[in-house]
C-alpha cells in the first residue's frame, strides 16, 4: 500500500503516516507540462502501471499538438480568475496551457508572477482581453464567487469575453490536462482563433 500526499498537506499528517509504517509518496505542485508528465509517470510506477501512465502522457502530447495547431492568431492577454480574485501566475499549469495556445497570462501585468489575489480595481484597470473562469453560471454560491459577477466585471467581460475551463480539468496537473487543452482550443474557436 502507498499513501499519495501533496507536499503542502499537513506535515504532521505525513509524519504520522510514516510513523505508522505507511509508505508515503510525496508530490510537489506541478508547475509545468514537463512536471505533469513526470508526475504521471511516477504515479504509474507507484501503482504498477507504467504502461497506463505512458498512454496518458501520449494523450497529453497529442492534445499539445492539437493545441499548437490551433494557436491564437492574436496573442490575447487572458487572466485566469477564480473566486475571491485568485489569479494564476506565470508559475502555474494554467499559464502553461495558455502559452501552448499562443495566449499570454495577464497576471504578470498585475504585478503577480506567482499565483495570488488581485483586487477588482486592478483587474478592471488592466483590462485583459479575456478572463478565464471555471464556470459560466450567473448565480454566485458564496461571496468569493460573487466577485466574478460584480457589475464592473460583467460590463467589461460579458459572456463573449469569458472563456470557461471547468476547474476539475485545470486545477491540478494530471491526465485531465488533455481535456483542458481541448477545451481551451474550443474556447479559442469561439473568438475565431
Where are these regions (language model features)?
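Acidic/His-rich segments in extracytoplasmic proteins that coordinate ligands and/or metal ions
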Residues: 1-46, 117-161, 190
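Structural signal for conserved beta-strand scaffold positions within catalytic alpha/beta enzyme cores
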Residues: 5, 26, 80, 105-108, ...
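Solvent-exposed, polar/charged alpha-helical surfaces in well-ordered, non-transmembrane soluble domains
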Residues: 15, 38-41, 45, 58, ...
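Sec-exported extracytoplasmic/periplasmic mature domains
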Residues: 18-22, 45-49, 61, 65-72, ...
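N-terminal hydrophobic signal/anchor transmembrane helix of membrane proteins
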Residues: 36-40, 49-50, 68, 73-80, ...
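Basic- and aromatic-lined ligand-binding clefts that recognize polyanionic substrates
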Residues: 52-103, 170
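His/Asp/Glu-enriched short active-site or ligand-binding loop at hydrolase and phosphoryl-transfer sites
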Residues: 93-115, 135, 161-164
Amino acid at each position: 500500500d502507498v499513501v499519495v500526499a501533496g507536499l503542502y498537506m499537513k506535515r504532521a499528517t505525513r509524519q504520522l503516516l510514516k510513523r505508522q509504517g505507511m509508505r508515503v509518496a510525496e508530490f510537489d505542485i506541478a508547475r509545468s507540462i514537463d512536471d505533469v508528465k513526470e508526475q504521471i509517470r511516477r504515479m504509474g510506477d507507484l501503482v504498477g502501471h507504467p504502461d497506463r501512465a505512458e498512454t496518458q502522457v501520449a494523450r497529453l502530447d497529442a492534445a499539445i499538438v492539437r493545441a499548437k495547431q490551433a494557436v491564437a492568431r492574436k496573442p490575447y492577454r487572458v487572466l485566469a480568475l477564480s473566486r475571491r480574485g485568485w489569479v494564476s501566475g506565470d508559475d502555474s499549469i494554467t499559464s502553461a496551457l495558455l502559452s501552448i495556445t499562443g495566449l499570454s497570462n495577464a497576471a504578470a501585468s498585475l504585478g503577480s508572477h506567482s499565483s495570488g489575489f488581485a483586487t477588482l480595481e486592478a483587474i478592471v484597470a488592466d483590462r485583459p482581453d479575456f478572463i478565464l473562469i471555471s464556470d459560466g453560471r450567473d448565480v454566485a454560491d458564496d461571496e468569493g464567487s460573487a466577485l466574478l459577477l460584480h457589475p464592473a466585471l460583467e460590463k467589461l467581460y460579458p459572456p463573449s469575453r469569458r472563456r470557461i475551463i471547468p476547474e476539475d480539468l485545470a486545477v491540478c496537473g494530471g491526465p485531465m490536462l488533455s481535456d483542458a487543452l481541448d477545451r481551451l482550443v474550443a474556447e479559442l474557436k469561439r473568438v475565431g482563433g
